[in-house]
Amino acid sequence: MALAFDEYGRPFIILREQEKKSRLQGLDAHKANIAAAKAIARILRTSLGPKGMDKMLQSPDGDVTITNDGATILELMDVDNQIAKLLVELSRSQDYDIGDGTTGVVVMAGALLEQAEKLLERGIHPIRVAEGYEMASRIAVDHLESISTKYEFSATDIEPLVQTCMTTLSSKIVSRCKRALAEISVKAVLAVADLERKDVNLDLIKVEGKVGGKLEDTELVEGIIVDKDMSHPQMPKRIYDAHIAILTCPFEPPKPKTKHKVDIDTVEKFQTLRGQEQKYFDEMVQKCKDVGATLVICQWGFDDEANHLLMQRELPAVRWVGGVELELIAIATGGRIVPRFQELSTEKLGKAGLVREKSFGTTKDRMLYIEKCANSKAVTIFIRGGNKMMIEETKRSIHDALCVARNLIINNSIVYGGGSAEISCSIAVEAAADRHPGVEQYAIRAFADALDAIPLALAENSGLPPIDTLTVVKSQHVKENNSRCGIDCNDVGTNDMKEQNVFETLIGKQQQILLATQVVKMILKIDDVITPSEY
């Protein structure tokens, strides 16, 4: 406990707990918060665009991840600072809602805070800056709506969807196969989409991977792939016109629910018990045969004796299948999951045209393909790759492509990429600033400057002089009144993004601006940071 005096000479007591806390107030607090956010944005800035760099992250367990997906980088970074954690949440929110644009949203938030710092140093109140940013974000979102284009597609004409997915995949490691992967992603989304209701359930798309083969071997399977094999090596490897019993109950004689003890003191009693168990299991197998099942898929295991009996009775079985996979199998085959064995009936069986076991390479790895299902609304994207890291990164890339295709089905408006949308918004926001006579005018201009961070980063990452490139494109926007001009990252020779087929979804771009502004406003309103000091 310590004694201190205020400005009037009155004594007051400082408790030991308060002595242990460090405190930042006013402009110092704002600067510390902005510095933390800028540090995170600086890390992600080099990963933006088709020429963006990848990051290698090592977990405490020694697992290595190589990725340029913003949400994944931030998820795996061990961030202590609370403001940095806000940006991690921001990226996760963009990933959850839109699936793409996770790097851009953090870069934009960092640029907005960098501009805000200059205004705060000039003595402008943070609330006025936040209000100016809110006005500017509304102007930018409305402008995006005005420059957007409706992109018509159908179940037969999927080229618009493929082109948009290719834009997403062009910044990933898998960009050399972007055409094939984009087509696979679009076909998978259309298989599970309800185009009339504009509804897509991505849970019906299973993404599975296996080390071996090359990326070009990635395929779309109209059915389900399960990383299991038949329970007995002598069971048939192909079953045509399969009737599948899907069990979540144990495929074995029932055990008493209460504590019990069985006294066996003679060989006869043991043989009676064994015979009873065998008889019970025999009846279970017979019931499966009677209802017409030609394949049993079980969530639980069964012992070797039961397995041998199944093989003898010519009833193929698969054991230890996960709950999520069982659900997908039930949806695909039109079957019902059976929780109690007594409820098994012919109506609850799933139907598939072909169930086959496929082996890979010289290893003993086998997987089960369930194809030609009664209901084709569940599909699997099966990824091949040279190593585990490649497969994991491909899964993340395909997730982004699936989300983009879904967003385009929900709302088929697109804006042009390559930084063209941000440059156009920057010009529109700058022009609108003059219509606001208050201090907010400075914040609106700062917002316009912050929007330039995306095209500047794209140019920088592509090895172009950033400021020179941006000024040329901006003047072209104004002279030609052409909102499609962006940064020519791939050195094609034209900066018209329509000719380069670089598209982004309107809702994704709007969400980026709104989420970044929202988080920046929250950070600007923090003027006091109290943290426990280090021991």
Curated annotation (Swiss-Prot):
<comment type="similarity">
    <text>Belongs to the TCP-1 chaperonin family.</text>
</comment>
<dbReference type="GO" id="GO:0016887">
    <property type="term" value="F:ATP hydrolysis activity"/>
</dbReference>
<keyword id="KW-0963">Cytoplasm</keyword>
<protein>
    <recommendedName>
        <fullName>T-complex protein 1 subunit epsilon</fullName>
    </recommendedName>
</protein>
<dbReference type="InterPro" id="IPR012718">
    <property type="entry name" value="Chap_CCT_epsi"/>
</dbReference>
<dbReference type="InterPro" id="IPR002423">
    <property type="entry name" value="Cpn60/GroEL/TCP-1"/>
</dbReference>
<dbReference type="InterPro" id="IPR027409">
    <property type="entry name" value="GroEL-like_apical_dom_sf"/>
</dbReference>
<dbReference type="InterPro" id="IPR017998">
    <property type="entry name" value="Chaperone_TCP-1"/>
</dbReference>
<dbReference type="InterPro" id="IPR027410">
    <property type="entry name" value="TCP-1-like_intermed_sf"/>
</dbReference>
<dbReference type="InterPro" id="IPR027413">
    <property type="entry name" value="GROEL-like_equatorial_sf"/>
</dbReference>
<keyword id="KW-0143">Chaperone</keyword>
<dbReference type="InterPro" id="IPR002194">
    <property type="entry name" value="Chaperonin_TCP-1_CS"/>
</dbReference>
<dbReference type="GO" id="GO:0005524">
    <property type="term" value="F:ATP binding"/>
</dbReference>
<dbReference type="InterPro" id="IPR054827">
    <property type="entry name" value="thermosome_alpha"/>
</dbReference>
<dbReference type="InterPro" id="IPR053374">
    <property type="entry name" value="TCP-1_chaperonin"/>
</dbReference>
<keyword id="KW-0067">ATP-binding</keyword>
<keyword id="KW-0547">Nucleotide-binding</keyword>
<dbReference type="GO" id="GO:0005832">
    <property type="term" value="C:chaperonin-containing T-complex"/>
</dbReference>
<dbReference type="GO" id="GO:0140662">
    <property type="term" value="F:ATP-dependent protein folding chaperone"/>
</dbReference>
<dbReference type="Pfam" id="PF00118">
    <property type="entry name" value="Cpn60_TCP1"/>
</dbReference>
<dbReference type="GO" id="GO:0051082">
    <property type="term" value="F:unfolded protein binding"/>
</dbReference>
<comment type="function">
    <text>Molecular chaperone; assists the folding of proteins upon ATP hydrolysis. Known to play a role, in vitro, in the folding of actin and tubulin.</text>
</comment>
<comment type="subunit">
    <text>Heterooligomeric complex of about 850 to 900 kDa that forms two stacked rings, 12 to 16 nm in diameter.</text>
</comment>
